[in-house]
Each structure stands twice: as C-alpha cells, then as structure tokens.
Design a protein with these regions (language model features):
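Predominantly the structural core of cysteine protease catalytic domains
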Residues: 1-178, 188, 192
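A short, structured loop/turn motif at beta-sheet edges
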Residues: 180-184
Length: 192
C-alpha cells in the first residue's frame, strides 16, 4: 500500500527530491527538518475531558489521532489558561476543531456557539427572544452580521458533546492570537 500511496503523492506533488538548495545551502529533506529551530519534543498535546483522570496522559479516542498520541488531561479552565499563556508568550497553538456545527461559517471566517437558552437572558432580552419564531431565532443567531451573546461552555457540556459524538475533531487549525469584537468581547484569531 505504501508504494501505491507514494505513487499518488508523486503524481500530484511531484517526486520527493533527494537534495535541494534553500537560501544557498544544499539540504536533504531530513537535514532541512533538522536545521529548523523547532523541536517537536518541545510540544505537548493538551486536552480536557472528564472520562479520564486529570493531570495524567491518555490516548485521546478520536479518529484523527491515528498515531495514538497521548495528551495531558487538565480541567477546562486550566486548558484555557494554557492557551492564553502560550499566546501571551508569542506561541501559536495547533487546534483540532469541529467545523461541522452551524456556528462555523467558512466564508465569513467565524466560529461561535451562540447562547440560545432563554433562561440565561435578562428581562427585556428574554421577552423579545420569547416572541421570535424558531426560524427568526436561528436567523438572528447564525446570520454572522453582528456579535451575539455566546454560550459559556462548561466542563460538563464539553464532555457531554464528546460522549454524544456532537463535538469531533474534524479539522485542524492554528490559534495565532487574540482580539476583541465591537462589544469588547475577547475572541481567538485562528488560521484555517
């Protein structure tokens, strides 16, 4: 099967060079990888789920983890602190994400989980929301024309979505920084 796969890759990308020149220096693919200032052993896989003990490593049970890499399991609040600390110190983060949800809009380059629970809304907002039809609510939540109130994701909500296969890791992206929306709410800047 490896020969077949390599033939497909060669057809679409061209044959892998034995040697090449970059910035005036000759490399093999292996020597070029070794010349980069990136040591993969300096990077860790961190996640947050309750079906494994916190502060231990485990193999995350998702289809994209085909190399059976282990992840450090930490509480969700600590995972968010790790993300923020990395960004504050000029590190980007690889992120396995679920882009199959209706809160992800590829062409408008936004991903949100809007608050749709009327009990979490204040008086006049809840009254107005209660008068909208289901179709009007969906249009308002997913028009992506202005910031909407976002759901506060808890450890339990994250675990339930994982257990029910609602939250998957169907797409890899890179978190590169933070910004704020028109209302001053923080969000992550992500390269798709």
């Amino acid at each position: 099967w490896k020969d077949g796969l390599n033939a497909i890759l060669d057809t679409y990308f061209g044959k892998m060079p034995e040697k090449f020149i970059y910035k005036g220096k000759e490399y093999t693919p292996h020597s070029f990888a070794e010349s980069l200032p990136v040591k993969m052993s300096d990077f860790v896989f961190v996640t947050s789920y309750t079906h494994h003990p916190f502060y231990e490593q485990y193999i995350v049970e998702v289809p994209d983890n085909w190399m059976w890499e282990k992840a450090y399991n930490v509480p969700l609040a600590e995972l968010m602190q790790i993300v923020d600390n990395a960004l504050e110190n000029n590190y980007s983060l690889g992120w396995a994400a679920d882009v199959s949800e209706k809160g992800f809009h590829r062409t408008k380059a936004i991903g949100i989980i809007p608050e749709d629970n009327i009990e979490s809304m204040s008086g006049t907002e809840a009254e107005r929301w209660g008068r909208l039809s289901a179709q009007e609510r969906a249009k308002e939540l997913y028009s992506f024309e202005k910031p909407v109130k976002e759901k506060k994701i808890t450890q339990e909500m994250r675990q339930e979505a994982f257990d029910n296969y609602e939250n998957t890791d169907d797409h890899g992206m890179v978190i590169i920084g933070t910004a704020t929306d028109q209302n001053g709410n923080p969000f992550y800047k992500v390269k798709n």
